[in-house]
Each structure stands twice: as structure tokens, then as C-alpha cells.
Amino acid sequence: MAGTTTHPEAFRNTVADLVDSTLSTTAKLVFRLSGSAASPGTAVATLSMANPAFGAASGGVITADTITSDTNAAGNASPVATATLQTGAGTVIVHTTVAASGDAINLSGGLTIGAGDTVACSALTYAAMP
């Protein structure tokens, strides 16, 4: 039987705020080659997030505060395929896909990042499950 699962907004806000608090004071947005949450793959660019990384949840969504550009990216020969939100110690909290458009995170400058390139993030939101 097919169906739809939803959660009350208050619960979604709790989950979204838990993501933020778990990221702690040194959160990072890391663009990566292929990988999974358990095995995130090679880091191409690492951007530091503000403390706290996100504002309070509303409607199950948190919006990132300032994200500092990586001004000396490691670079890659293969396209970026994933991104992680992780603690400063490297614990992955969120793993998502990346594409040029129509994905969870969209890279407007292309998916291949050159060594030494600057990688910036102009806006980022996280939405807890519906």
C-alpha cells in the first residue's frame, strides 16, 4: 500500500534545530566527490559556517548564517557530486547530492573546481522531513 508520511511542524522544527545544535560551534560545508554519509568521499572545498551555523527553525526549515568562502580549494578532476554538513571534527551530520541545477545543492560555476579556486555559498537552507 502506497501512502504519504508527514510530521507535525513542531517536530520538524525540533529535528531541524537538532541538526544545527549537533553541528556545534565549528560547522563546515564540504563539497565532495561521490560518497555517502558513512563514507563521505574526497573533499574538494571546505567552507566554514558561522556560530551558530543556522537560525532557529520555522516551518521545519533552518537558514544558514554567514558561510565563509574557501579561497584555496583542493580542486578535483572529477565532478563534485555530494556535499556534507559536518562538525569541525569531521563528523557528518547531513549528506546530500550536488548538481549544476535542480538538486539539493546547485553549483552555478560548474561541478569541476580547480585547485586554488575560491568556492562560495550565497545561501543555504536545510528542511527537515515533511
Regions found by a protein language model. Name each.
Residues M1-A83, T87-P130:
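Small cysteine-rich, disulfide-bonded extracellular modules of the LU/uPAR three-finger superfamily
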